[in-house]
């Protein structure tokens, strides 16, 4: 997982200009961030490590500094296959979070998928010979849609090994790339 400080920056006004790039350390007690999204006057942070979960940092007094950091939801997962990217929904009203297959599903308010995960195999299972992800069963990695307050979570897609990020096309269709192996 990634360690380090959260930073914010202002890029020069145009490529090749002499404008100054300004970078400042943010005073938020967060590490191991794998996903960042600024939306709804808040910085949302997907933490993949100690304290894994979805966090929200806000400036509540208008001084241009984050003075409130709230853990919206704990997520049971960490490491290279834990919580990852955050994206704004195509309609701009909610957040999508991507979690790898070592992140257990959280409690969902609703789901677009059947909840009766099946491990029915025609042939005997062949676990990874190197031992990776042995015992990790369906639904695998998953993608959820979350309201800005972090209260309502809808499972929208699952079955991934370790998708790190997603995006949407102009029609609002979701695209994911299943990383590794």
Where are these predicted regions, by residue range?
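Beta-propeller domains with acidic blade repeats across secreted/periplasmic ectodomains
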Residues: 1-181
């Amino acid at each position: 997982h990634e360690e380090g400080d959260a930073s914010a920056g202002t890029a020069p006004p145009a490529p090749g200009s002499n404008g100054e790039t300004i970078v400042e350390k943010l005073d938020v007690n967060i590490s191991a961030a794998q996903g960042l999204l600024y939306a709804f006057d808040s910085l949302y942070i997907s933490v993949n490590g100690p304290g894994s979960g979805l966090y929200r940092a806000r400036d509540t007094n208008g001084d241009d500094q984050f003075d409130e950091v709230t853990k919206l939801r704990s997520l049971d997962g960490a490491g290279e296959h834990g919580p990852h990217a955050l994206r704004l929904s195509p309609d701009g009203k909610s957040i999508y979070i991507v979690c790898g297959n070592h992140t257990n599903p959280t409690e969902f308010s609703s789901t677009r998928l059947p909840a009766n995960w099946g491990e029915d195999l025609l042939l005997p299972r062949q676990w990874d010979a190197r031992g990776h992800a042995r015992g990790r069963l369906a639904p695998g990695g998953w993608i959820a849609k979350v309201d800005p307050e972090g209260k309502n979570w809808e499972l929208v897609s699952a079955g991934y090994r370790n998708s790190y990020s997603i995006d949407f096309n102009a029609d609002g269709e979701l695209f994911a790339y299943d990383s590794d192996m």
